């Protein structure tokens, strides 16, 4: 288009649906099994929430286009692979699709219970109405077992930084949003601020977790925390894996530097020495500058008597791109291998994503702004977080595949805790990984 002309107008969900093929599925019940009861088909309420209203709109658009009814089927967390196997063994379709945490989807994929979405007729992972580039972050080679996006509520699982406004204001850091929107917002900067705020504690030989002021903590200082920090480095075990054969693409120099920097971050005296309720209490009592955790934890922090703000997780270094990393609890959508009519499933899944387009993302954002955020600066931070939501294919599938975990999550968390050389520690795993890659994710 010529310079100065109108920007390209984005299509609405209704308009996207018009671009999809016509079919008459009148009377068909489209079943989504999910661990998130009420997310796909909200319970009827007198005053439905914003996200519920967006879900209802999506379901109505799908019904109007194809004559179907969208129904939810309850699924217990951790049981997906078993449920799918039981149904398949009995020769019955368990559901048209499943919405479950990444770790459950990975286990089901590894058990051979999920369809490669590229073999689902009509289904288009790269359609403009998908959440990009997130929708192809879960692709390795020409294989994808689960897709993530606003339609699956993925943004709720993004890792973010909460800061204690009172504590930081007092220390002279009174424009955190401005800082977070600049090039200067790196993990090193966060650590520097944290260590300044916790200066007295830094000087102590043995800090007291129940009284002293600390710099940062997560809720559980567990593997998910370590791997979220790792993702700030921008280094991915498989690189940009979509369309590329499954192989290790670590940039060893960059990776080692990231591991060393993060190791020091985790070893700093500014890091709160406990986790769980005591970390939450410290943040609530104004003794913790930063709380690094999932976006959906905002609802818990809202119950605390503390003045907090929201910031995107910074990039590890100034030349890196910030990401809002996802973890193993992030919900994605997969399709059971046994399908009565895979063409119908593909067409209806396109409709599911097209009919969720934009307004589901907007509803998720508005929900946070409306209930938890204080002002326009905070709304802009939320938008930055949403704009940078990314996942790492290796980390998404690692919970199901020991061969992937061995060269990614297991190894990285151990190196972050104990130090060591990535390259030399990878060496013993290379042969078995290369073997695995010959027959998986082709």
Region spans (language model):
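Extracytoplasmic/periplasmic substrate-recognition and gating elements
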Residues: 302-369
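Short, solvent-exposed loop/beta-turn-alpha elements that line the ligand-binding surface or hinge
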Residues: 122-129, 180-182, 235-255, 318-324
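Glycine-centered hinge/linker elements that transmit conformational signals in sensory
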Residues: 191-194, 227-275
């Amino acid at each position: 288009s010529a310079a100065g002309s109108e920007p390209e107008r984005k299509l609405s969900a209704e308009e996207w649906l018009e671009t999809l093929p016509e079919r008459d599925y009148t009377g068909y019940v489209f079943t989504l099994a999910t661990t998130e009861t009420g997310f796909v088909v909200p319970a009827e309420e007198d005053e439905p929430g914003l996200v519920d209203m967006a879900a209802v709109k999506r379901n109505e658009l799908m019904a109007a286009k194809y004559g179907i009814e969208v129904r939810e089927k309850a699924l217990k967390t951790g049981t997906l692979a078993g449920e799918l196997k039981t149904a398949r063994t009995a020769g019955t379709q368990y559901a048209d699709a499943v919405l479950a945490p990444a770790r459950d989807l990975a286990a089901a994929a590894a058990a051979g219970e999920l369809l490669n979405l590229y073999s689902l007729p009509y289904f288009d992972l790269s359609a403009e109405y998908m959440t990009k580039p997130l929708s192809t972050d879960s692709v390795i080679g020409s294989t994808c077992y689960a897709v993530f996006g606003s339609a699956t509520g993925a943004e709720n699982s993004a890792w973010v930084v909460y800061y204690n406004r009172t504590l930081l204001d007092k220390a002279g850091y009174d424009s955190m949003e401005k800082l977070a929107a600049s090039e200067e917002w790196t993990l090193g900067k966060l650590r520097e601020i944290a260590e300044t705020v916790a200066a007295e504690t830094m000087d102590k030989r043995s800090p007291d977790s129940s009284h002293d002021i600390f710099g940062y903590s997560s809720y559980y200082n567990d593997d998910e925390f370590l791997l979220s920090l790792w993702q700030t480095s921008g280094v991915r075990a498989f690189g940009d894996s979509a369309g590329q054969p499954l192989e290790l693409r670590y940039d060893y120099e960059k990776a080692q530097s990231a591991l060393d920097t993060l190791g020091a971050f985790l070893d700093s005296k500014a890091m709160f020495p406990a986790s769980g309720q005591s970390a939450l209490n410290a943040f609530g009592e104004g003794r913790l500058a930063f709380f690094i955790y999932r976006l959906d934890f905002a609802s818990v922090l809202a119950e605390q008597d503390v003045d907090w703000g929201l910031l995107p997780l910074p990039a590890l270094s100034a030349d890196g791109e910030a990401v809002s990393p996802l973890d193993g609890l992030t919900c994605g959508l997969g399709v059971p291998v046994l399908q009565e009519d895979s063409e119908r499933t593909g067409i209806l899944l396109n409709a599911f994503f097209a009919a969720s387009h934009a307004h589901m993302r907007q509803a998720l954002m508005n929900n946070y702004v409306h209930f938890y955020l204080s002002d326009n600066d905070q709304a802009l931070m939320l938008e930055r977080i949403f704009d940078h939501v990314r996942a790492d294919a290796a980390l998404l599938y690692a919970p199901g595949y020991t061969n992937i975990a061995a060269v990614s999550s297991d190894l990285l968390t151990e190196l972050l805790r104990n130090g060591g050389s990535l390259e030399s520690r990878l060496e013993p795993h290379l042969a078995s990984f290369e073997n695995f890659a010959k027959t998986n994710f082709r």
